[in-house]
């Protein structure tokens, strides 16, 4: 069996690592660098350049030089964040036939996994050159807050690059592995604050010593998959464009060549300002007009840069707060803070983290290499070369299905340790319903419509039965890569149907962030909605069971009783259509009161309960483990 390499597929830079003789080795690329720019260029002669060579020619070939493609992976074209990116990058982002965001180079449309695969190929070749043997297996890292479709797309990129992706693991978890392997014995809790080129993640991780084994358990994770060093660069680029416009009256944003030079200069200035108080951005011949060539020369102080990006740094603190709350611990319980990602070298970021957590971050973890090193350790664990490490990661968002009344019923809560498998029994909403539609959702809201739809599938050929009698078992299974598989089974017939969530149907980061923010802000609204939906379902069930009881009773019900019951039923049906929970509760009580004498009369006359009454009893009063589900009936037209 060959070596399993660890790859950090980053937004700005990528890195490859291997475990050799018990030590983790970061492998230098052909240019002698330990990290490779995540940049791909398509030359006019058809050559594909990757890494430093692509970066060097970017100024002369801006339209065909692709960078930060990871921000597009697993995303829809119409997402707001993609539309924002279109304004900022010199290359062309286009809408694919499946509505995904793709890029166009030399008239050819390409999917982000296809482009990311070129970087992975470079990483694979780097490892092969070093090892002197073929490499076919890898562990690839992704931001902890990547959703299902983004993980799937990353796996696809690996497959395109000729790699069997043995595991997708979360970047902060990988960094904790790299940090925790050589630590002294004993338990400790760490925060991994990962601010990379395009994404931000924070994870609370408990590292425990159990019978000589290092156990890494992720207690909670949070983040923002569209916040990173690229956004800091954009702020600086915008500032430089504005300064140049004030001075010359010319807008550089329409000039791809000038913008590419500005991007490089802004990135360089940002890096310099981490160690200097001031720097110059000097770009001669940036553009020209009728009066001649124009030069850009702007002095930038560290204080100026900090004022431009202060709100971006502050945006990282709320996810930290939520992660601590979800983990059920306070700041005082944190033993160490680990900074990962090149952007954490910025003094303002370090100060903000120190102020929030009340302790200095550790400096013994290389922010650019820790993630790839952790991936290599996980690769060695999977290969059986490392036996004393156990990694317990989590699913970042709640997963469930839509049930009766437009409610999202959760099957797997957020921050559940993966891999995991959960099942729940649901039933039908109508008598003789022949098929159900399973609507899979991801998000934190109680109202199904407020969450993201991941997919739908049908389970057909359910034998005719009263509503509430069929037993439909829905199973959610998240594998160790965080990828979701959903299945449904009719327990009576054994018929099953399943779905793997496809790569083009995932959540956008803004939606995820918004869901959790909304869930925090609207928890009271959600609670009221849930109570109203429960009351409506109770009212519907009572109407159904009462009408059935009256029909079964036949002439045992007097005309007066029938009239009173029908009036109460109509009143309850009207109340259920409204939004007043108290009114529904009152009408439920009223109908229960007027129908009680008939129920008592029938009970008294039935010395022996009829065997056939069992399904009715079960549909009238649901068993605790059966949830009413609003499934669509699929008509079979023959």
UniProtKB/Swiss-Prot annotation:
SUPFAM superfamilies: Actin-like ATPase domain (SSF53067), Heat shock protein 70kD (HSP70), C-terminal subdomain (SSF100934), Heat shock protein 70kD (HSP70), peptide-binding domain (SSF100920). The modification Phosphothreonine is found at residue 199. Residues 605-617 have a biased composition (Low complexity). CDD domains: ASKHA_NBD_HSP70_DnaK-like. Induction: By stress conditions e.g. heat shock. Keywords: ATP-binding, Chaperone, Nucleotide-binding, Phosphoprotein, Stress response. HAMAP family: DnaK (MF_00332). This is Chaperone protein DnaK.
